[in-house]
Amino acid sequence: MRVSFKRFLTESGRFAEILQYGCGKHERELLPIGSVRKTGAFRTVGKKSALNQHSRRPDTVPLVYQSRSWNNGVFIGSITGSETTAAAAGAVGVVRRDPMAMLPFCGYNMGDYWQHWLEMGKKLGDKAPKIFNVNWFRTDDEGHFIWPGFGDNLRVLEWILKRCDNEVDAVETAIGYVPKPEDINLEGLKDFDKEKLASILKVDNAKWAKEAAGVEEFYKKFGDKLPQELRDELNGLEERTKA
């Protein structure tokens, strides 16, 4: 049944499009579907473009969501991180922020780096790609991963492409736009249904209010280097979680 889903993507032309988001330097060999244009940190195929942020969180962050705007997407990237586990040094369950997975590699102040992204959005205007965040690592009460992951991540990437084409609606939440469970193809998945999917798409405002408090502490490290736009986004998140 897994092959059936892959065949569906292939026949619809979406499998090649999805490969675009993970094929790196091999994109020209893998994608004989037209010219590929590289612009900054993202690639476009035809009229489609998307940026994908990644989180590794056992709860709070949904399986996938779309940012509310370019600035909101930069904000999402600035607060990404993972929770410490028993295998990691330090306290368990503490969120370690790694903005845009660049903290160990950025050779200058992260505040300036974020400002660069914000300026890039201004230059791109309505040509800016849509920004998404994925979190494959939601767990149940026993610590088991809920989403099957691996090749089934294509199902989520297909939804992202559909959003880029305005083919599906989404549910507005305090953090952005999440899928309707029926809009993610679950064909062939065993022991996984729309109820499980709904559980990892849920946005808990109380947890996000706590998250916002943690971001507030994190942002203090950057002092006057923190762009005002990100401060505004944090304030907006705090207000929306109270609604």
Residue ranges, per PLM feature:
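Conserved NTP phosphate-binding and transfer environment spanning the P-loop NTPase/kinase superfamily
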Residues: 1-243
